[in-house]
Design a protein with these regions (language model features):
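PDZ/PDZ-like domain micro-motif
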Residues: 107-121, 173-176, 543
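PDZ-domain C-terminal substructure recognizer with occasional recognition of PDZ-binding tails
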Residues: 101, 123-125, 136-176, 331-332
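Interdomain regulatory linker/hinge segments that flank or connect interaction modules
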Residues: 27-80, 149-151, 156
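Feature responds to low-complexity, polar/acidic, surface-exposed segments characteristic
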Residues: 5, 418-453, 468-484, 491-516, ...
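C-terminal "post-core" interaction segments
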Residues: 179-442
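PDZ/PDZ-like peptide-tail recognition elements
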Residues: 63-104, 164
Length: 545
């Protein structure tokens, strides 16, 4: 694989779009030229032949490749860089089908006060249905004190409801930090913008002498610019942070210089959610690959593509002349973690899979310094790190549920010890410890796989919710499963998107398993036998794992 440093023009990985398809001042022939030059994949000629920028972008069906007017582009930059704006306080992303999806909600904003949540979908604004070709930002924004009515499909229930919100000026806080419990450096990063790396460095320097653990909260971070890489400064030693592959097949890379200062050797715990996307996923994957910490939370959004913003400041003068305050944001790269893994569609799986309600509390139970006396403490060896947990704190009513779920989330590779006396550590299983402490513990592992040579692999997948068994807690490892059932199970577990293409001649388009088989094939998980998949052939559950 060839490597080159990433040129300045192509170094931006922006994700949020505040618009759908506004009327474009960009000439259609210029849109064609830019897409043919920079888009990550070859675009069918019938799409490029369409008669307007709006039609081309709509047919492309890429929610990340968008045109922004000057007003919309400025609003986008305000959101990324942390400015004060008038609105309802949400970051949104175009949906592939209908409406726009809320990715995060600002504290003390009208949206938060109304009870909206990340994952909710805005279907209409003041009775105007949001469809392709419409700009939701111009409908949502307005004067301070005026009202706007949103039709929302609630993520939690699927119910559609109207919410009337009063617009107000909201400041978009990119990074905030605080020393929690006297020894945890807590850094909340809601976006990657121009000031992010400087503020994070400030946090590391200010709290570094006291921090026994770093927590970086990316749960509301939908990405931003490529400062996800510069955010890494201070934790990482030199090395590649991300590979980005464009349509030319060359792998560009972003790296930390060998002379970059290392401000801390204290491990970092990254908090993730389904709304952590793009640069947030890039950072979480780099933390894992470079072994400087772990992640706790839920699987991330799964945006493994990066965008280039072409505007009047583009280094290519010919391109810059095409714009006057507006821009065209184009998907130009697929990005990969330093270990070669992609998060596209599948997301980044955290080290500990913890529910949203318990994520923060579980992380705050961990410490990196060994206590002077073992008695009353727990030692956890996980993913190459050793953490310590104060038992009385973990058993407190405020932390009991989070602690129980942390024990349930431990994979087979983790080792758990209970301290006694001055320096004695006795290994225990999470289930045994939970029983001694009277916790309401439910094992995610299977009760009938201990004799299988694949027991650890099976139980690891079970802990991360990637395979399921029977209601009685068994897996039946020697039973068989068809290839069609296997494909459908894994595609569902990974939440793979269904492609339009059919890959195998023996998989009918209307077969119940067709979506799963084609989704797996599109991601390259298997290729079948020539053009034949053999959906009815069987494998055992063990072989499946």
């Amino acid at each position: 694989m060839k490597h080159r440093t990433l040129p300045g023009l192509l170094s931006t990985a922006l994700i949020l779009s505040l618009c759908t398809l506004p009327a474009s001042a960009l000439e259609t022939e210029d849109t064609r030229m830019l897409l043919e030059t920079y888009y990550v994949d070859e675009i069918p000629q019938e799409i490029l032949n369409l008669d307007s920028t709006e039609a081309i972008l709509e047919a492309l069906n890429d929610p990340y490749t968008v045109y922004m007017s000057a007003e919309e582009y400025q609003a986008f930059l305000n959101q990324v860089d942390g400015e004060t704006v008038v609105g309802i306080g949400v970051s949104i992303q175009n949906a592939v089908d209908d409406g726009v999806q809320i990715l995060s909600i600002l504290d003390n904003s009208p949206a938060q006060e109304a009870g909206l949540s990340a994952g909710d979908r805005i279907l209409a604004v003041d009775g105007v249905t949001l469809t392709s070709g419409m700009d939701p930002s111009t409908l949502i924004r307005g004067e301070v004190g005026t009202s706007v009515t949103l039709t929302i499909r609630l993520h939690s229930t699927g119910e559609e409801k109207d919410f009337t919100l009063e617009r107000k000026a909201v400041t978009i806080p990119i990074v905030t930090y605080d020393l929690v419990d006297g020894d945890v450096g807590y850094i909340a990063c809601d976006s990657f913008g121009a000031s992010t790396s400087d503020t994070v460095r400030e946090a590391l320097e200010e709290m570094g002498d006291d921090a026994n653990l770093w927590v970086v909260d990316l749960r509301s971070n939908p990405g931003g610019t490529d400062t996800a890489v510069t955010l890494s400064l201070g934790w990482f030693e030199s090395g590649v942070m991300v590979y980005m592959m464009g349509r030319d097949g060359l792998a560009y890379y972003r790296a930390i210089r060998p002379d970059a200062p290392d401000l801390t050797d204290v491990p970092v715990v990254v908090l993730t959610s389904p709304w952590s996307a793009s640069g947030a996923e890039m950072f979480a994957a780099a933390v894992r690959a470079h072994h400087i910490g772990i992640a706790i939370g839920q699987r991330t959004y799964g945006k493994g593509v990066a965008q280039t913003v072409l505007d009047e400041d583009s280094s290519n003068g010919t391109i810059a002349e095409l714009f006057d305050g507006d821009c065209l944001k184009i998907t130009t790269y697929r990005f990969y973690a330093p270990d070669g893994a992609t998060n596209d569609t599948v997301g980044v799986l955290p080290t500990l899979l913890i529910s949203q309600g318990n994520t923060e509390a579980a992380a705050l139970l961990l410490r990196s310094n060994e206590p002077s006396i073992a008695n009353g403490s727990l030692k956890l060896e996980l993913a190459g790190f050793t953490f310590y947990i104060d038992e009385s704190t973990a058993r407190h009513a405020d932390n009991r549920d989070a602690f129980t779920e942390l024990l349930e989330a431990l994979p087979p590779s983790a080792k758990l010890y209970r301290g006694s006396g001055g320096s004695t550590w006795t290994e225990m299983t999470p289930a045994a410890l939970a029983e001694e402490l009277g916790l309401d513990f439910t094992s995610r592992m299977f009760s009938d796989v201990s004799d299988s040579p694949f027991a650890d692999a099976i139980n690891t997948l079970a802990v991360y919710g990637l395979v399921s068994g029977y209601e009685d807690g068994t897996f039946h490892p020697e039973e068989t499963i068809t290839r069609a059932e296997f494909a459908s199970m894994v595609a569902s577990a990974l939440d793979l998107r269904v492609p339009e293409q059919s890959y195998f001649s023996d998989v009918a388009a209307d077969a119940w398993y067709a979506d799963g088989v084609n989704a797996m094939a599109a991601k390259g998980f298997f290729a079948g036998d020539g053009s034949v998949f053999r959906p009815d052939d069987t494998i055992t559950y063990e072989e499946m794992v």
